[in-house]
């Protein structure tokens, strides 16, 4: 349960009009058939009979097969790169299965190389062509600091206590040395 201040702030930050026609694609995965991966990219077919109304989000997706020859060579991840990614992301995925999953995800994203972007200007923001309405920075309710602080898991005096920063994983050599010396 949020206090009145927090609930009011959340209401004020909601968009005035909800998004219309947001496309939900749940099946964005490569289909495996006979140990061969087939790739497809999403395209939009516009109905020219209704030219007056052009939605920003396509109404019906279609899939266009992408030939394996159109994709760049498959990316192979070296053990050194896996080690560096593990330390940066603080995630242990160095198993053969984890590396295989990462290589498949990169291969799926390789389809972006096929898209023709000639003459397309890069965007600074997705919303750069719209006027963004900001609410005035005025206090509508007050004296709710105590209520907000009660929602915090840890506080020191009248401040929220942030959790400690991430502790980096040791390098591969250090991890193997630690495992050799451990009792497990």
Swiss-Prot record:
Q: Which SUPFAM superfamilies match?
A: Glu-tRNAGln amidotransferase C subunit
- What Enzyme Commission number(s) appear in the record? 6.3.5.-
The transit peptide region is found at 1-47
Q: Name one GO biological process term.
A: mitochondrial translation
Mention one GO molecular function. glutaminyl-tRNA synthase (glutamine-hydrolyzing) activity
Question: InterPro entries, alphabetically?
Answer: Asp/Glu-ADT_sf_sub_c, GatC
Please tell me whether the keyword Transmembrane is annotated for this protein. Answer: no
Substrates-to-products reaction catalysed: L-glutamyl-tRNA(Gln) + L-glutamine + ATP + H2O = L-glutaminyl-tRNA(Gln) + L-glutamate + ADP + phosphate + H(+)
Task: Report if keyword Transit peptide is assigned.
Answer: yes
What domain of life does the UniProt record list for this protein's source?
Answer: Eukaryota
* GO CC term (a single one): glutamyl-tRNA(Gln) amidotransferase complex
Primary localization: mitochondrion
Compartmental location: Mitochondrion
Which keywords has UniProt assigned to this entry? ATP-binding, Ligase, Mitochondrion, Nucleotide-binding, Protein biosynthesis, Transit peptide
Q: What class of enzyme is it?
A: ligase
Instruction: Write out the similarity annotation.
Output: Belongs to the GatC family.
What the protein does comes down to:
Allows the formation of correctly charged Gln-tRNA(Gln) through the transamidation of misacylated Glu-tRNA(Gln) in the mitochondria. The reaction takes place in the presence of glutamine and ATP through an activated gamma-phospho-Glu-tRNA(Gln).
Q: How does it assemble?
A: Subunit of the heterotrimeric GatCAB amidotransferase (AdT) complex, composed of A (qrsl1), B (gatb) and C (gatc) subunits.
How is this protein named in the record? Glutamyl-tRNA(Gln) amidotransferase subunit C, mitochondrial
Organism of origin: Danio rerio (Zebrafish)
Lineage of the source organism? Eukaryota, Metazoa, Chordata, Craniata, Vertebrata
Q: Gene behind this chain?
A: gatc
């Amino acid at each position: 349960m949020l206090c009145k201040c927090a609930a009011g702030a959340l209401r004020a930050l909601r968009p005035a009009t909800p998004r219309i026609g947001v496309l939900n694609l749940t099946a964005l995965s490569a289909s495996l058939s006979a140990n061969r991966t087939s790739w497809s990219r999403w395209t939009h077919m516009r109905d020219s009979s209704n030219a007056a109304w052009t939605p920003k989000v396509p109404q019906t997706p279609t899939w266009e097969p992408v030939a394996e020859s159109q994709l760049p060579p498959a990316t192979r991840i070296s053990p050194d790169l896996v080690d560096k990614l593990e330390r940066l992301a603080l995630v242990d995925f160095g198993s053969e299965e984890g590396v295989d999953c990462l290589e498949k995800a990169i291969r799926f994203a390789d389809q972006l190389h096929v898209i023709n972007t000639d003459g397309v200007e890069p965007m600074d923001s997705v919303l750069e062509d719209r006027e963004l309405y900001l609410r005035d920075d005025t206090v509508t309710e007050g004296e709710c600091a105590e209520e907000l602080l009660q929602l915090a898991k840890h506080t020191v005096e009248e401040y929220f206590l942030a959790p400690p920063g991430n502790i980096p994983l040791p390098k591969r050599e250090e991890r193997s040395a630690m495992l050799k010396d451990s009792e497990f």
